[in-house]
Amino acid sequence: MAKGIRSIRGFSDILPEQTPLWQFVESNIQATLEAYGYREIRLPIVEKTELFSRSIGEVTDIVEKEMYTFEDRNGDSLTLRPEGTAGCVRCGIQNGLFHGGQPRVWYAGPMFRHERPQKGRYRQFHQIGAEVYGESGPGVDAEMILMTARLLRCLGLEDVRLELNTLGTGEARAAHRAALVEYLQAHEDRLDDDARRRLHSNPLRILDTKNPDMQALVEQAPRLMDYLDEDSRSHFQAVCRVLDQAGVAYRVNPRLVRGLDYYSRTVFEWITDRLGAQGTVLAGGRYDTLVEQIGGKPTPAIGFALGLERLVSLLEESGISGPQSGPHAFVVSADSLRALPLVEGLRDRLPGLRLQMQTEGGSFRSQFKRADRSGAALALVLGEEELAEGRFGVKDLRGDAEQQRLDPEALSDYLARRWPELAATEVTD
């Protein structure tokens, strides 16, 4: 017997009993985004490698170690997208989306990073992200954070907390970087291998170290907040004031720097303690120089992304599940081939009807067991007599209503009257 083929490590299947919760999450997020004026954009999952090295940063972990990169038959270097923002910007430049407007877009789909799989971290993972272009003031920063707070509330998540920081302008970061490198060089004997590697290429990321032996050193490091220009400082204070007035709790975390080089000014994360080290549920920030960096005209921008696997895991732990949309009715037939045209006619009359049948047939006993397990409220019976007459027997599976026999038109009227109570009770199959 041939050896079975299994999924790749870090790539997971999402099974039918799991998808209702995913659909619940996705539909609620989509409704919230569209209520704030965002429109969906659909992007390729493969882009030129240069797009990510120019946007994310050549010395970031993502570009150095985590991207799935390959050469195609033309010799071009291509990469499975590790995140969505760079592709969104590329699309906006290529298709003229930034000309004379302030587009708001959202996207959803799989991303790919060659990381070590663990709870909350996968090599293929699903993100939903949203981006706003052309708005530079603190109002859009505050609105986006308030929108993410509403989005998480709509999903029923309560034990998440908000952390904020500002990364200032490029000039402020350059001044802070010089002071930070000088400080770290003076304590180089206390740096771990990863920090030594980053010292001259990306020292800001050292502040985000997870090494407990370096926490005290990092706590005493120069703070970016002390190097901010006045515009960045007042911008951040305005964002915080709006959150205060709206009653959204937050903590300013000066070590919050995000893992992508393109961020500037406001950055934020919603985090939880329930996912171990992978505690970030949703994160984002402003990236005012990225559009120009990729080849467009200077365009301010802000965005966020959330990981669906982490969000779904949190909801499952909280006992939240999506609606199980089983059939309204289950067809029990003596001959499925003769029954199918009658069933299709019923679907034509009631397009919203969820109707399931066992096309392989089987005994009435086994079909009724299957009907009961499906969660359907009704069984529509097509025995030999019903098939000969072109009528349906109607049996109530959840109540004690008397069984009756109806022609297709009368059955359509009957189902329409009972529509509010026909939702499936529970799918147990």
Swiss-Prot record:
Q: Which InterPro entries match?
A: aa-tRNA-synth_II (IPR006195), aa-tRNA-synth_II/BPL/LPL (IPR045864), Anticodon-bd (IPR004154), Anticodon-bd_dom_sf (IPR036621), His-tRNA-ligase (IPR015807), HisRS-like_core (IPR041715), HisRS/HisZ (IPR004516)
Which keywords belong to this entry?
Aminoacyl-tRNA synthetase, ATP-binding, Cytoplasm, Ligase, Nucleotide-binding, Protein biosynthesis
Which superkingdom, per the lineage?
Bacteria
Q: Where in the cell is it found?
A: Cytoplasm
Query: Could you tell me which Gene3D superfamilies the record lists for this protein?
Result: Anticodon-binding domain (3.40.50.800), Bira Bifunctional Protein, Domain 2 (3.30.930.10)
One BP annotation, GO: histidyl-tRNA aminoacylation
The reactions it catalyses are: tRNA(His) + L-histidine + ATP = L-histidyl-tRNA(His) + AMP + diphosphate + H(+)
What's an example of a GO molecular-function annotation for this chain? histidine-tRNA ligase activity
Q: What is its EC number?
A: 6.1.1.21
Q: Which CDD domains match?
A: HisRS-like_core (cd00773)
Instruction: Note the NCBIfam families from the entry.
Output: hisS
Task: Check the record and name the HAMAP family matching this protein.
Answer: His_tRNA_synth
Q: Per its UniProt record, what PANTHER family does this chain match?
A: HISTIDINE--TRNA LIGASE, MITOCHONDRIAL-RELATED (PTHR43707:SF1), HISTIDYL-TRNA SYNTHETASE (PTHR43707)
What is this protein's record name? Histidine--tRNA ligase
Organism of derivation:
Alkalilimnicola ehrlichii (strain ATCC BAA-1101 / DSM 17681 / MLHE-1)
